A protein has these predicted regions:
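N-terminal "mature-domain start" segment
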Residues: 20-54, 85, 147-153
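Positively charged n-region of N-terminal signal peptides that target proteins for export
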Residues: 1-4
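Signature of long, low-cysteine stretches enriched in small and polar/charged residues
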Residues: 84-121
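Short, solvent-exposed coil/turn segments at beta-strand boundaries
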Residues: 31-36, 53-56, 66, 96-100, ...
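Surface-exposed amphipathic alpha-helical segments
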Residues: 130-155
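A short acidic-to-branched-hydrophobic micro-motif
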Residues: 49-77, 125-133
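C-terminal motif of bacterial Sec signal peptides marking the signal peptidase cleavage site
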Residues: 15-18
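Repetitive helical segments and hydrophobic/amphipathic motifs
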Residues: 11-12
Length: 155
Protein backbone atom coordinates (compact mmCIF):
# COMPACT_ATOMS: atom_id res chain seq x y z
CA UNK A 1 0.00 0.00 0.00
CA UNK A 2 2.86 2.43 0.84
CA UNK A 3 4.49 1.74 -2.52
CA UNK A 4 1.20 2.38 -4.29
CA UNK A 5 0.69 5.70 -2.44
CA UNK A 6 4.29 6.74 -3.10
CA UNK A 7 3.84 5.87 -6.78
CA UNK A 8 0.57 7.81 -6.92
CA UNK A 9 2.21 10.87 -5.28
CA UNK A 10 5.13 10.67 -7.71
CA UNK A 11 2.75 10.55 -10.67
CA UNK A 12 0.81 13.52 -9.28
CA UNK A 13 4.03 15.48 -8.74
CA UNK A 14 5.20 14.76 -12.28
CA UNK A 15 1.78 15.71 -13.62
CA UNK A 16 1.94 19.00 -11.70
CA UNK A 17 5.41 19.80 -13.05
CA UNK A 18 4.40 18.86 -16.57
CA UNK A 19 1.28 21.00 -16.35
CA UNK A 20 3.35 23.96 -15.21
CA UNK A 21 5.67 23.62 -18.18
CA UNK A 22 2.77 23.48 -20.63
CA UNK A 23 1.01 26.62 -19.39
CA UNK A 24 0.71 29.58 -21.71
CA UNK A 25 2.95 32.54 -20.92
CA UNK A 26 -0.09 34.65 -20.00
CA UNK A 27 -0.90 32.35 -17.08
CA UNK A 28 2.23 33.71 -15.34
CA UNK A 29 1.47 37.39 -16.00
CA UNK A 30 -1.01 40.01 -14.82
CA UNK A 31 -2.73 40.27 -18.21
CA UNK A 32 -5.45 42.61 -16.93
CA UNK A 33 -2.85 45.20 -15.95
CA UNK A 34 -0.84 44.68 -19.14
CA UNK A 35 -3.94 45.11 -21.34
CA UNK A 36 -5.00 48.27 -19.50
CA UNK A 37 -1.60 50.02 -19.50
CA UNK A 38 0.20 48.77 -22.63
CA UNK A 39 -0.18 47.84 -26.29
CA UNK A 40 0.41 44.15 -26.93
CA UNK A 41 2.59 43.89 -30.02
CA UNK A 42 3.10 40.13 -30.16
CA UNK A 43 1.67 37.23 -28.20
CA UNK A 44 1.69 33.45 -28.46
CA UNK A 45 1.97 30.54 -26.01
CA UNK A 46 5.71 31.08 -25.49
CA UNK A 47 6.17 34.86 -25.46
CA UNK A 48 4.52 38.25 -25.12
CA UNK A 49 5.83 41.64 -26.15
CA UNK A 50 4.12 44.87 -25.09
CA UNK A 51 4.91 48.58 -25.35
CA UNK A 52 3.90 51.84 -23.71
CA UNK A 53 0.61 53.29 -24.91
CA UNK A 54 2.07 56.76 -24.38
CA UNK A 55 4.72 56.99 -27.09
CA UNK A 56 5.76 60.48 -25.95
CA UNK A 57 7.12 59.30 -22.57
CA UNK A 58 10.64 60.48 -21.74
CA UNK A 59 11.59 56.80 -21.30
CA UNK A 60 9.68 54.63 -23.79
CA UNK A 61 9.60 50.97 -22.73
CA UNK A 62 9.22 47.67 -24.56
CA UNK A 63 8.72 44.60 -22.37
CA UNK A 64 9.26 41.06 -23.62
CA UNK A 65 8.64 37.88 -21.62
CA UNK A 66 9.63 34.58 -23.17
CA UNK A 67 9.51 31.01 -21.90
CA UNK A 68 12.81 29.24 -22.51
CA UNK A 69 13.81 25.67 -23.08
CA UNK A 70 15.24 24.21 -19.90
CA UNK A 71 18.59 23.38 -21.50
CA UNK A 72 19.03 26.99 -22.66
CA UNK A 73 17.83 28.44 -19.36
CA UNK A 74 20.23 26.29 -17.34
CA UNK A 75 23.24 27.16 -19.53
CA UNK A 76 25.66 28.75 -17.03
CA UNK A 77 27.27 30.81 -19.81
CA UNK A 78 24.11 32.50 -21.12
CA UNK A 79 24.95 35.88 -19.55
CA UNK A 80 28.57 35.63 -20.74
CA UNK A 81 27.34 34.94 -24.28
CA UNK A 82 25.06 37.98 -24.11
CA UNK A 83 27.95 40.09 -22.83
CA UNK A 84 30.15 38.89 -25.68
CA UNK A 85 27.39 39.70 -28.19
CA UNK A 86 26.88 43.23 -26.82
CA UNK A 87 30.61 43.96 -26.60
CA UNK A 88 30.91 42.84 -30.23
CA UNK A 89 28.33 45.54 -31.08
CA UNK A 90 30.38 48.18 -29.15
CA UNK A 91 27.81 48.45 -26.36
CA UNK A 92 28.69 49.40 -22.79
CA UNK A 93 27.94 46.86 -20.05
CA UNK A 94 26.46 48.76 -17.10
CA UNK A 95 25.76 45.78 -14.85
CA UNK A 96 26.14 42.02 -15.00
CA UNK A 97 25.56 39.16 -12.58
CA UNK A 98 24.58 35.49 -12.96
CA UNK A 99 20.96 36.28 -13.96
CA UNK A 100 20.92 39.87 -15.25
CA UNK A 101 22.73 42.04 -17.76
CA UNK A 102 22.08 45.77 -18.29
CA UNK A 103 23.54 47.36 -21.40
CA UNK A 104 23.81 50.85 -22.87
CA UNK A 105 23.23 50.09 -26.54
CA UNK A 106 23.37 53.62 -27.93
CA UNK A 107 24.13 57.13 -26.68
CA UNK A 108 23.78 59.74 -29.40
CA UNK A 109 22.42 63.30 -29.59
CA UNK A 110 20.71 63.18 -26.18
CA UNK A 111 19.11 59.85 -27.04
CA UNK A 112 19.89 56.73 -25.07
CA UNK A 113 18.94 53.12 -25.72
CA UNK A 114 19.23 50.46 -23.03
CA UNK A 115 18.56 46.73 -22.87
CA UNK A 116 17.94 44.83 -19.65
CA UNK A 117 17.81 41.04 -19.78
CA UNK A 118 16.99 38.89 -16.79
CA UNK A 119 16.46 35.16 -16.39
CA UNK A 120 13.79 34.37 -13.81
CA UNK A 121 12.80 30.93 -12.56
CA UNK A 122 10.39 31.97 -9.82
CA UNK A 123 7.35 30.80 -11.86
CA UNK A 124 8.82 29.02 -14.87
CA UNK A 125 11.98 29.43 -16.92
CA UNK A 126 11.48 32.96 -18.28
CA UNK A 127 13.66 35.45 -20.05
CA UNK A 128 12.55 38.98 -19.20
CA UNK A 129 13.78 41.75 -21.49
CA UNK A 130 13.17 45.47 -21.22
CA UNK A 131 14.28 47.80 -23.99
CA UNK A 132 14.26 51.49 -23.16
CA UNK A 133 14.57 54.53 -25.37
CA UNK A 134 15.18 57.67 -23.33
CA UNK A 135 15.88 61.34 -23.92
CA UNK A 136 18.12 61.41 -20.83
CA UNK A 137 20.81 59.20 -19.39
CA UNK A 138 19.34 56.79 -16.85
CA UNK A 139 21.08 55.85 -13.63
CA UNK A 140 21.72 52.26 -12.63
CA UNK A 141 19.02 52.65 -9.96
CA UNK A 142 16.49 53.83 -12.55
CA UNK A 143 17.34 50.85 -14.75
CA UNK A 144 16.90 48.44 -11.83
CA UNK A 145 13.54 50.10 -11.09
CA UNK A 146 12.51 49.27 -14.66
CA UNK A 147 13.57 45.65 -14.12
CA UNK A 148 11.54 45.61 -10.88
CA UNK A 149 8.57 47.00 -12.80
CA UNK A 150 8.93 44.20 -15.38
CA UNK A 151 9.02 41.61 -12.61
CA UNK A 152 5.90 43.17 -11.07
CA UNK A 153 3.90 41.80 -14.03
CA UNK A 154 4.54 38.26 -12.78
CA UNK A 155 1.65 36.76 -10.81
Amino acid sequence: MKKFLAFLLAVLALTFVACGKDKDIESYLDMERINSEFNIEKQDNEQIKFTDKDESRSAYRIFNFQKMKSVDFKNPKKIDKLEEFYLGKNCDIIYKDESTIIVLVLAQDNSYAYNIQNFDDSKTELMIAVSIGSDKELSEDELFNLLDEAKSFLK
